[in-house]
Amino acid sequence: MAPLVTVVILSYARPDPLRQAIESVINQAYPSLDIVVVDNKSQKSEAIARVVSRFPRVRFVQNEENLGFAGGMNAGIAAAAGEYIYLSEDDVALRPGCLSSMMAYLERHLDAGLVAPVMYDQSSGSVRSAGGRFALDPVFALKIITERAPGQGPLPFDVMYVPGASILARAQLLKELRGFRDDFFLYQEDLELCIRVLKSGHRVVTVPAAGVDHVDPPPGPASDMVEYFRIRNLFATYVLHAPARVLPAFVLRYGVIDVTRTILRNPRRGWLMVRAWLSVAMSAPRLLRDRDPRPLEASNL
C-alpha cells in the first residue's frame, strides 16, 4: 500500500485560485492522499471556507489570526496525518503525475530531505524556479535556476534551495526540525529551512519530472511589510547560520553602508532597513541561542 501523503495547502485571502489548487491535488494519480487546507485569517476567510466546503474529503484548519507563511504552514504540519507531507499554496496547481514522481524519488533515496518539482509560471509556461544555490558570504548571493543547466537532463539534481510553496518531505524530518521558524512570519523562511535540512546531513533535490503551475502575482511594488520581512529575515538567517568570519563584513556592508546609502536615496526603504536591523538586534538572544555555525558545502554559484 502506498504511504499516506498529507498535502497542506496554505490559503490567505485568495479564494479564487484555491479551488483550482484543491482540484489539482484531488486529480493526482497518487492513491493515498490526506488533504488539509489551512486558512490564515483574512477578510476573505468566509469565501475560503465556502470553497473548501465543496470538497468533503478536505480537512479545514482555520487559524484565529494571520500566522504568516511560516506559522500557517506549521499549523498544517501539526495537523498532518501522513508519513509524508507536501507543502503547497492556494496559487499553486499540481501538474498530472507531480506527487507520484516526487514520491518515487523520495522513497528510493533516504538521504533526500526536501524534494521539489519544477515551478512554472501559469500564464507563460516559463520556468519560475527549479531550485537554486546560494552562498552566505559577505555579499549574499542566491541564484534561482530558471532553465535546465547543461548535463542535468530530465534526471533529478541536487540544489541548495527550493521554494517553500512546493516542498515534499518526510513528516518525521519536518517535525524533528520543528518546521519553519515562526518568528520569520514570511519570506526567507524557506531558505532558512533548507539550510537546516542541509546541515542535518540531508539533500535538497529538484525532480524535473514533477511540475507545478504558479499563478502570476499581480504587477506592482512589494508592500512595506513584505520588504521589511524580506530584509529582516535575511539578516536573521546570517546570525543563525553564517560563518563567524563573515558576520563583521556582512554587518558593515548591509548594516552600515547599504543602510546609509538607502536612507539618502530612498528614506522610506532606508527606515525599513533600520527597523529590520533593530528587530534582529532585539531578537539576538534567541537567534544566538539557536545559532548553528556548522559550515555548508561550497555553493558553486
Which residues make up each language-model segment?
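Glycine-rich, basic loop-to-helix element that forms the pyrophosphate-binding segment
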Residues: 63-80
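Cell-envelope/extracellular polymer assembly enzymes that use nucleotide-activated donors
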Residues: 4-6, 34, 192
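Catalytic core of nucleotide-sugar-dependent glycosyltransferases
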Residues: 204, 209-212, 222-247, 270-287
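Non-catalytic, C-terminal membrane-associated alpha-helical segments of glycosyltransferases
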Residues: 245-301
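Acidic/His-rich active-site region of diverse nucleotide-sugar glycosyltransferases
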Residues: 78, 93, 98-179, 183, ...
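Donor nucleotide-sugar recognition loop
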Residues: 159-167, 175-206, 210-213, 222-229
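Short aromatic/hydrophobic "clamp" motif used to bind/position activated sugar donors
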Residues: 85
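Short, acidic, metal-binding catalytic loop of nucleotide-sugar glycosyltransferases
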Residues: 23-32
